[in-house]
């Protein structure tokens, strides 16, 4: 049976094994998928050991940059992202590194009926999560995409790097005031029960769509703030399922149906 897994530390909380088990059952693929607690001080050796038999793996924090460096070949979107969340062993034994995060976000937004083309998008944060989704968002040709970060210089850096891909600009949080069509929260503020300092004027009730890359059983602080102002909101559980489907297709050549898997995970979250 073909062996797959997910590298992380910690890894006990990961929903990836359940997601891929549901995908495998649905598509009739014979495979195993396990959580892999990798050591913080020697990820490459641990990963190479797994790939003596393993066919592919997902990579989560804190190993995405190390996976990027150890891949023998990179997809264009992984190269742009500077991080790898999916590894595939090729026929010749080399490792292909991919990044499916941005494709997962875009797929979930489209599933929710969000139009990206010609829209004004605000992306909060300037870390790895934001870097990973910039290219796929810009591929849909928004009218404008603003990267906002507490430290505006980090947002500026990303704008310079990705400038040729579309209409990008950078901002600090305090300078934001103009209403937008879509806000994507790529900060980890929700994990700490916090909210970036945002002006209520960014949201137009009934028009602005607000998406948090984080998810939890209860609405995140960001989603609560947005909903109170009349925005439509969605958390990142669908992104998790969609990026997993993208990885599954890379490994197995078959695209699973994500809707029933997302519904099952949502039911379990309560």
Swiss-Prot record:
Pathway: Metabolic intermediate biosynthesis; chorismate biosynthesis; chorismate from D-erythrose 4-phosphate and phosphoenolpyruvate: step 4/7
Stored Pfam families: SDH_C, Shikimate_DH, Shikimate_dh_N
Active site: 64 (proton acceptor)
GO molecular function, one term: shikimate 3-dehydrogenase (NADP+) activity
Membrane-spanning parts: none
Annotated residues for binding of shikimate: 14-16, 60, 85, 101, 215
InterPro entries in alphabetical order: Aminoacid_DH-like_N_sf (IPR046346), NAD(P)-bd_dom_sf (IPR036291), SDH_C (IPR041121), Shikimate_DH (IPR011342), Shikimate_DH-bd_N (IPR013708), Shikimate_DH_fam (IPR022893), Shikm_DH/Glu-tRNA_Rdtase (IPR006151)
Sites where the protein binds NADP(+): 76, 125-129, 149-154, 213, 236
SUPFAM superfamilies per record: Aminoacid dehydrogenase-like, N-terminal domain, NAD(P)-binding Rossmann-fold domains
Assigned GO CC terms: cytosol
Alphabetic keyword roster: Amino-acid biosynthesis, Aromatic amino acid biosynthesis, NADP, Oxidoreductase
Enzyme class: oxidoreductase
Domain of life: Bacteria
EC number from the UniProt entry: 1.1.1.25
One record GO biological process: aromatic amino acid family biosynthetic process
Reaction catalysed by this enzyme: shikimate + NADP(+) = 3-dehydroshikimate + NADPH + H(+)
Function text: Involved in the biosynthesis of the chorismate, which leads to the biosynthesis of aromatic amino acids. Catalyzes the reversible NADPH linked reduction of 3-dehydroshikimate (DHSA) to yield shikimate (SA).
Family recorded in the similarity comment: Belongs to the shikimate dehydrogenase family.
Subunit field text: Homodimer.
NCBIfam families: aroE, PRK00258.1-2
Protein name: Shikimate dehydrogenase (NADP(+))
Lineage: Bacteria, Pseudomonadati, Pseudomonadota, Gammaproteobacteria, Pseudomonadales
């Amino acid at each position: 049976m073909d062996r797959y897994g997910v590298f992380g530390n910690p890894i006990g909380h990961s929903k990836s094994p359940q997601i891929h088990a549901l995908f495998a059952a649905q598509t009739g693929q014979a495979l195993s998928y396990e959580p892999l607690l990798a050591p913080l001080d020697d990820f490459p050796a641990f990963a190479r050991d797994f790939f003596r038999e393993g066919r592919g793996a997902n990579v989560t924090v804190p190993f995405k940059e190390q996976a990027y460096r150890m891949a023998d070949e990179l997809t264009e979107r992984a190269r742009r992202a500077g991080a790898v969340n999916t590894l595939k062993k090729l026929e010749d034994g080399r490792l292909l590194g991919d990044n499916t995060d941005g494709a997962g976000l875009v797929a979930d937004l489209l599933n929710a009926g969000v139009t990206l083309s010609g829209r004004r998008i605000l992306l909060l944060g300037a870390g790895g999560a934001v870097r990973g989704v910039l290219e796929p968002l810009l591929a849909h040709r928004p009218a404008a995409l603003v990267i906002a970060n507490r430290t505006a210089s980090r947002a500026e850096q990303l704008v310079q790097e990705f400038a040729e891909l579309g209409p990008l600009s950078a901002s600090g949080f305090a300078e934001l005031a103009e209403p937008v069509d879509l806000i994507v929260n790529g900060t980890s503020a929700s994990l700490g029960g916090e909210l970036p300092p945002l002006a209520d004027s960014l949201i137009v009730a009934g028009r602005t769509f607000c998406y948090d890359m984080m998810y939890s059983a209860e609405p995140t602080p960001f989603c609560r703030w947005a909903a109170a102002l009349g925005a439509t909101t969605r958390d990142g559980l669908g992104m998790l399922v969609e990026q997993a489907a993208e990885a599954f297709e890379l490994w197995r050549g078959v695209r699973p149906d994500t809707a029933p898997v997302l519904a099952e995970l949502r039911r379990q979250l309560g």
